[in-house]
């Protein structure tokens, strides 16, 4: 059970704090409600670019990392399709260093032409190395583009093309900063061994003076329901052919999420899982196999993927996946299978609650979802999933017309 207190400052910043008496560290987390989904289709990759730019210093603090290091702390960040997260861990007595740094870059980021060009080069090189020049690098990008035709989930966090980053102007990025990086679009979450009211007062001290910006959010286009199967085959210079089947499913706050997460673990969570046992060990069709959910806020994807062994045709692998899907749709999962997966999730959740950084991140995440109480309710939500729910989800989701199939063939 994670206890917390919440306050919304006059400028719109949401603050959530948790007292952890067992830790000598403080975790300070800032979540900005901006990800790839908030980008202009003609200017993608900006949220990820800003993950880099936010470490380039402000007018008051030219070197962001130096004060963190002097305070014996550590910091990092990540960006996904739905949000951007910045976090700092440091000794609890130095907590105000983290609050000072985060409040300063929320308002005073110093974006110069030189800094912008330097980070553009870094991001473009990352794009090339991870997605264009690396084996299988463009596979997830191709699958997204196949499954989504309207929603901005059709591009990855890195963007649609490096040309969008190369063409970004100073005016473009300053406008993006003004639109998305301000108090009412952010959540500050803290876990440390301090009285909650004191932590809330410290948040007031450092963040209340910041002015908010009035911004009209752009609507996110809704992805139309897929009615017909989609297929794409590409050939690349890779060691082995891979096959991916992606099915649309509900978003993060839908009941679909819990059922789908259990199903994905039931299918591929370890050596005793169905897909590994049947397709890797017994039938020897695949070298590796996975089933996972994207976990996006808006309706996301349930993906089956496998790397084919030499001698396995894509048609064989696809037929094997279909057979596993049909079993899910027709034969109730055993109580033992389902209970094993539920126990694993509960254990992981309880273990994660021991870490101050996990708690700070999760407080921000659930507040962003709009249901902060869910931080203490997800175990019960997973526990409530029945074998009947798994059957119903599988029948509703794993339909041929709801499937996008990508065959990523190795050149002969």
Where are the model-predicted features located?
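M16/insulysin-pitrilysin zinc metalloprotease superfamily fold
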Residues: 57, 89-122, 294-352
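His/Glu-based metal-binding/catalytic segments typifying zinc-dependent metallopeptidases
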Residues: 20, 29-31, 145, 215-274, ...
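Histidine-acidic residue clusters that define the catalytic metal-binding segment
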Residues: 1-6, 144-186, 218-223, 349, ...
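An aromatic/glycine/proline-enriched structural segment found at the starts
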Residues: 5, 149-150, 154, 182-251, ...
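M16/MPP (pitrilysin/insulinase) zinc-metallopeptidase core fold and M16-derived inactive scaffolds
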Residues: 27-89, 155-158, 270-285
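C-terminal regions of mature proteins
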Residues: 187-190, 307, 327-328, 332, ...
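A structural supersecondary motif
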Residues: 69-70, 165, 244-248, 267-308
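Buried hydrophobic packing residues in well-ordered domains
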Residues: 12, 30, 48, 86, ...
């Amino acid at each position: 059970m994670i206890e917390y207190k919440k306050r919304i400052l006059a400028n719109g910043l949401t603050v959530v704090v948790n007292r952890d008496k067992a830790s000598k560290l403080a975790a300070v987390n800032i979540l900005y409600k901006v990800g790839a989904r908030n980008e202009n289709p003609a200017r993608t990759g900006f949220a990820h670019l800003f993950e880099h730019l936010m470490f380039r210093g402000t007018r008051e603090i030219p070197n962001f990392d130096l004060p963190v290091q002097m305070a014996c702390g550590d910091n990092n960040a990540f960006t996904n399709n739905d949000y951007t997260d910045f976090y700092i861990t440091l000794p609890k007595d130095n907590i105000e260093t983290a609050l000072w740094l985060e409040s300063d870059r929320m308002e005073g980021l110093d974006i110069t032409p030189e800094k912008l060009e330097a980070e553009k080069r870094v991001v473009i090189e990352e794009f090339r190395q991870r997605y264009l020049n690396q084996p299988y690098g463009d596979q997830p990008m191709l699958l997204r583009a196949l499954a989504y035709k309207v929603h901005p989930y059709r591009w990855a966090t890195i963007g649609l093309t490096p040309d969008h980053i190369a063409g970004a102007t100073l005016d473009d990025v300053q406008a993006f900063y003004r639109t998305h990086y301000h108090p009412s679009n952010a959540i500050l979450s803290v876990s440390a061994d301090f009285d909650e009211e004191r932590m809330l007062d410290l948040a007031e001290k450092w963040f209340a003076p910041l002015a908010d910006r009035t911004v009209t959010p752009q609507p996110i286009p809704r992805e139309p329901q897929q009615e017909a199967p989609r297929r794409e085959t590409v050939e690349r210079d890779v060691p082995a052919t891979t096959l991916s089947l992606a099915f649309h499913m509900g978003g993060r706050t839908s009941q679909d999420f819990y059922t789908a997460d259990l199903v994905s673990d039931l299918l591929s969570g370890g050596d005793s899982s169905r897909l590994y046992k049947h397709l890797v060990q017994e039938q020897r069709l695949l070298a590796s196999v996975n089933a996972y959910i994207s976990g996006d806020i808006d309706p996301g994807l349930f993906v089956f993927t496998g790397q084919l062994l030499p001698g396995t045709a894509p048609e064989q692998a696809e037929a094997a996946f279909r057979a596993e899907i049909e079993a899910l749709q027709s034969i109730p999962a055993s109580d033992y299978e389902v209970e094993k997966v539920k126990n694993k999730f509960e254990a992981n959740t309880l273990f994660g609650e021991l870490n101050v950084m996990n708690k700070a991140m999760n407080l921000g995440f659930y507040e962003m979802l709009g249901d902060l109480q869910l931080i203490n309710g997800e175990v019960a939500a997973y526990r409530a999933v029945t074998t009947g729910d798994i059957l119903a989800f599988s029948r509703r989701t794993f339909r041929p017309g709801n499937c996008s199939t990508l065959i990523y063939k190795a050149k002969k």
